[in-house]
Amino acid sequence: MNIFNGVTQFSIPDRTVVTFGKFDGIHMGHMALINTAGRIAREQGYKLAVFTFDVPPTLHFEKFEATQITTNYEKRKMFADAGVDYLVEYPFNENTASMEPLEFIRKVISGNLNAAHVVVGSDWHFGKDRSGNCDVLMAAQKLYNYEVHIVEKEKFEQREISSTWIREEIQLGNMENVNILLGYPYMIIGNVEEGRHLGKEMGFATVNIYPSPEKLLPPYGVYASKVIVDGEEYYAITNIGVRPT
């Protein structure tokens, strides 16, 4: 997977099928976009591209909080596993945020991304003050030689799946609901830290994981889990909170 991180001057030589999103928490709705774009890319012989931002737009305007359901590292891994050929992590700053919708279409969608097909959600907005929408995107498709595909929002129990909803469930510790809404098990990927080896004294293996600081964690408590080490899966009990071992 080719990655363009934090740059505005780049060019993709291949014609692409591209989908857009903040992808602040990759859930069933996001996977519907990626899967639709991937299917079109395979059928048409184009490359699959994902466009997102190097930092979530909310972090640009607000103080830092641990609110990411899916960290940047986790997102990259999931995109690669989904067969994405090009990942664009576009810089979000005053200059790029003030880009008019038609300028964004001309410079980025048609220019940088070399898009043949554009796959977006029905509520997608882009450009200065979020003034661009699906109607604007479709109005320009003939001029810039791309085709628009609109994917409806995924729902669970008649409610639209959103990152906001998933954050609420994580903060409540409703991890079964979280896994349903994500479409895969909630995960924590982190570095191993040296502990006090108390688990060894009690006759079972333990490992202390330090998660990424932007990762949104469930409440302190003990959770049934699986641990993957060097590709091997183990059933485990995970303690979220002050390390006991």
Segments from the language model and where they lie:
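Short acidic-hydrophobic, aromatic-tinged amphipathic segments that line or gate anion-handling sites
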Residues: N2-T8, V88
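Residue-level signal for inorganic ion chemistry
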Residues: H27, F79, V118, V178, ...
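Classical nucleotidyltransferase
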Residues: S98-A205
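A glycine-rich helix N-cap at a beta->alpha junction
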Residues: E74-V88
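A short acidic, helix-capping loop that chelates divalent metal ions and anchors anionic groups
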Residues: P57-E62, N95, E160-I161
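Phosphate/ribose-recognition catalytic cores of enzymes acting on nucleotide-derived substrates
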Residues: G195-T245
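N-terminal catalytic cores of NTP/NDP-binding nucleotidyl/phosphoryl-transfer enzymes
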Residues: Q9-T71
